[in-house]
Amino acid sequence: MYSGRLFVPLQAEKRKKMKVAVVKYNAGNIYSVIHALQRLGVTPVLTDNPEELQKADKVLFPGQGEASNAMRYLREHNLDKVIRDLKNPILGICIGQQLMCRHSEEGNTDCLGIFDVDVLRFQPQRHEDKVPHMGWNQLRFAQTEELRVKGEKFQLIDSGLFKGFTEGEFVYFVHSFYVPVCADTIATTDYILPFSAALHKDNYYATQFHPEKSGSVGERIIKNFLEL
């Protein structure tokens, strides 16, 4: 009778064979994501080659940087169209999440438009509200939770990215701009106001926080993504 004990090594073996691509573009903090993947037994390729991205089983779109510069690079290398047309799962991280949105206040930048929401700059309400939002903060997510923002209701849906998680896990953030809670929100965090900590639509996943800097919690999130 199968006991489930083979699940972990079988998944690890599957990850070794997986074709994983990391989008190369004008952004920083790429190599910490590559190292996180390597710790999980994955050998990713860092590329701005459209064909390699299209052939990958999973794509990660991480980075820190400025929205207009990043979008300029994506357009010049035809990566904007490639990312919008991907069929396999892709995970945007930090600015990667923001670039998947419709528009960013950072540099008044038109973005990829995958998520139908605009990226806004944090507006401190109190003296103790510091921008950027930097450090550890908690995730809120539940399949039946409803969150009111500006009078609108949104249903938060379990996407599989947080499989096995309980509410209140801490993850690491560094950002001055945020994605408001929207129809594609799957996790929120409170800082100045509730905002989208993670998004999901079809094969597109995104986190505002850095799973690669979030210790064992972040490792589980990356592992869940690879196993989607």
For each feature predicted by the language model, list its residue ranges.
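Extreme N-terminal starter segment of soluble prokaryotic enzymes
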Residues: 18-21
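Structural motif
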Residues: 60-62
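Short hydrophobic segments within beta-strands
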Residues: 23-25
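Cysteine-nucleophile active-site neighborhood
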Residues: 65-137
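Short acidic low-complexity segments
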Residues: 44-55
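Amide-donor transfer/coupling interface in amidating biosynthetic enzymes
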Residues: 85, 118-228
